[in-house]
């Protein structure tokens, strides 16, 4: 019954610069382009003065308010999809330290104000929202009082949503083998991929289920193989290293480096470490053992 009933506002913060001197201007500019595109896309449904109202505002939170007010005047509601909400905030924490990061995520920081505006209109205009990010750190710092969302990161219902089961990987390889694109036995390729790409699990309640293969890595392997009919020389896709670089910087600047280094050493030597996964924690508490282990989990290690 709700099909085609809502407008969709999709936003991504992945391209916002993390230079503290340019960040807010980049954020406002990025949001302005998104809101302008939204107004043009739905021009036949919105009041004719909507775009003008949006462009008269200087900051993103005010532009969002203008959009929401226009929708409310027309009796319309929207779905908000916010992708990589924490990208530039995490970069600030890694590259510029906690003081700059705190000014962004606490008090009257522009990103915090933007999310406050989102909350203000959830009962009138924003019918549903879907927010994605890398780690729970920024969400904890940004959303005190943002008690309108539920964290689905470790919900067992979604455990199999992103990765591939081994049966799915095998089906993919068998398809290309039948097409004559793969000359190696499928079992041989599975044995190559399994130590590198298998054993992912996204919920403690799913530990007894079959583990998942990293879908990005599997597709990287298959794409490389189809080009050369040989497995890739480097089994790890370099495009997936960004989060590991962030983690390395976090460890280097952390005052408790020695303690957390032992956790990494434990993973290297024993293949695992045990802890309770935290749904969220503030940046100032990253060094606490369970928080640090949780960060490793969210970074996919």
Model region roles, listed by residue range:
Residues 1-40:
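P-loop NTPase motor core
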Residues 14, 83-84, 113-139, 143-146:
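A short beta-strand-to-loop transition that corresponds to the Sensor-1 phosphate-sensing loop
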Residues 26-28, 94-102, 142-156, 219-236:
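Short secondary-structure boundary/capping segments
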Residues 47-69:
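Short glycine-rich substrate-engagement loop in P-loop NTPases that contacts/grips substrate
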Residues 74-104:
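Conserved P-loop NTPase "ATPase switch" module shared by AAA+ and STAND
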Residues 207-210, 220-300:
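Conserved helicase/translocase motor-coupling segment
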